A protein has these predicted regions:
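Mixed-charge (Asp/Glu-Lys/Arg
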Residues: 1-48, 53-167
């Protein structure tokens, strides 16, 4: 398959801003395909250290997104450092908090590429649930917890379990 990288003019969003928006669109697309709505946190309104909320019929799951081209999930896990403020906020949340690491190529032009009959996302993502009882300054995101359609079923079960329900 021949692919064409995107030619990208500099229209103002720096690479970190692009990573933030891309990770949100990655998860938004997955949720849309599964028939779920999401509530993205408006830029500069991230006062609870939550980037998006996944809306299940019964309740919600909160998600903190990280996007990296450096953490490539080459090993069995990747470490993500946590701010004390995030830990404090997530520990008070009544809803489950999931941390998602979206991995993208180092060259931004290859995050999405065009082929003759498709657009391909060159990204993959992994997740871990934040343990509210721990006070660690980092989390290990396991390679085994790849974000797929089944991840949403797992999260749904965790959300329901918090209210005494089951899937």
């Amino acid at each position: 398959m021949s692919v064409t990288p995107w030619a990208l003019p500099n229209w103002g969003l720096d690479e970190n801003g692009a990573k933030s928006r891309y990770s949100l669109s990655f998860m938004d697309g997955l949720c849309a395909q599964a028939g779920l709505t999401v509530l993205p946190t408006q830029q500069d309104s991230d006062v609870h250290a939550i980037d998006m909320t996944v809306c299940f019929p019964e309740s919600h799951a909160q998600v903190q997104l990280k996007c990296s081209s450096v953490k490539a999930m080459d090993g069995e896990e990747e470490r993500i450092d946590l701010d004390d403020e995030w830990i404090s906020k997530w520990s008070r949340s009544m809803l489950p908090v999931f941390i998602v690491l979206v991995v993208v190529p180092s060259d931004i032009r290859y995050w999405r590429v065009d082929a003759p009959r498709q657009t391909v996302h060159n990204a993959h993502a992994y997740w871990v649930q934040f343990d509210k009882t721990a006070n660690r300054k980092s989390v290990l995101v396991p390679r085994a917890q790849r974000v797929t359609r089944k991840t949403l079923d797992e999260w749904h079960g965790i959300v329901l379990g918090g209210f005494g329900g089951t899937v």
